[in-house]
């Protein structure tokens, strides 16, 4: 039997270096990177790097050998090789100035088809939805770029078209759930086919080119090349799921004959599609409001998990109310307010919206419409105001969506200091620090109900205690009266007769009195016991030695650390580091909160002092004038 050589089996054969992979595939480094991005192959980190590198100690980029074998059978490899041949022949034609042959070659430029790769990487539609977050974020970013060196204008236009189509689906399906404004952009979260899809839309600022090449636009452009094909497939499937025509089209009522539509119908339609303010054409010819079916709780409770089912039903009812949150409201967006995010929000929840026609095409009514209920303004003052509408700041729309109810508008008027904009993506169960504003907004109605019920229970307990006290007082008074009567008869009544000289009938009466006294004693004891049960006793102060408590916690932690298995020590240390970082973050947030509150308190005190000084000065001036 032949003795096996070293590094011929095990971890050494499971990994392959990037240089060896390039030799195996016969590709350049740029083509290999492009192929790996399109196929979803990425470098791996071995458990024992020295073994995986066959004894070498230098740091190399390693891939799974199975992944490289998987790339060998890909048809794109041949297309990438054809690129080299095309580049050589086209450069030769350009050098000898054979432009006729060069034109013919450019018409036969080899194109990469990625349809089969999308189907291969995402076997089911749900798999594609799970990986839609990065796709949407990157395409929304590229849709804002102008024509750059490595980003052609056609690619940016394609990203813009696909993202607008996806937003039309979100509006038509009313699947938007959460929104948030941050320094990075606008966060949106939609629920599609039971999957939560979150993406970021950047702020609408002018593009500023960077002098330093810190971002590799070439690699990002390869990702965009794959994601555009993927989102195209996804939009097609989503539109047909709602019986919407794809590509998006308008009903004949929208395309009325006008000078603008007759001049260039294609640009007219594309502008109206980008406006996100019109209903799309449906293939079923019937437009009905999709209503969720009521759940038969009697049948579902037989499963033995009624609490979970009731919670699901409550969540479904909240979502159904959220879908019609802005129904019956008409909004008007001022020219200084970002148009597209607010149009997405308002139309996703059943509202109507318009803007100045000079800003963008697709407005349906002007500012003078008397039926407008809310006008969104982001300036300190406005010259002309209507009494029939509320002038609010844009944050009101976002906060209403996150709270799933229409909030009072008095805190969002023009010139008002806005309340904190809380993130809906925070998990209250995982995060230990919760701002007081969020605690107040969690469920104020439930808090009031609890307070009211506690007051009622306290009143009832107080009434019961008063009743018991009155009964005890009556029993004690009756007992005292009986004792006084017995003593009076014992030591002499009004006739001067002693107890020893009384008749036998008096003895019988005394025995009856003794029995009554015993009954009263028992009743008094019982009432006193009941009072002791319901009465509040003064508590005792137990002094806690913080040093001993801290020492006990440290000892317990050390004992846990010693009990951890050696193979789980790294995981244990990681969990401890995460816990310490969370505690540190919570401490910093609380410290920041205290600093802000102290500064606000000092500012209020200063303002009060200034007001008093001004009032005193005004009073002194008035007194001088009076004299």
Curated annotation (Swiss-Prot):
Location in or out of the cell: Nucleus, Nucleolus; Nucleus, Nucleoplasm
Sequence ranges of Low complexity compositional bias: 616-627
GO cellular component: nucleolus; nucleoplasm; PeBoW complex; preribosome, large subunit precursor
GO molecular function (one): RNA binding
InterPro entries named in the record: BRCT_dom, BRCT_dom_sf, PES
GO BP annotation list: maturation of 5.8S rRNA from tricistronic rRNA transcript (SSU-rRNA, 5.8S rRNA, LSU-rRNA); maturation of LSU-rRNA from tricistronic rRNA transcript (SSU-rRNA, 5.8S rRNA, LSU-rRNA)
Keyword Cytoplasm applies: no
Region annotation Disordered: where it falls in the sequence: 450-469, 488-562, 595-627
CDD domains reported in the protein's UniProt record: BRCT_pescadillo_like (cd17709)
The UniProt record lists the keyword Nucleus: yes
Similarity comment: family membership: Belongs to the pescadillo family.
Function in brief: Required for maturation of ribosomal RNAs and formation of the large ribosomal subunit.
Protein name, UniProt field: Pescadillo homolog
Lineage: Eukaryota, Metazoa, Ecdysozoa, Arthropoda, Hexapoda
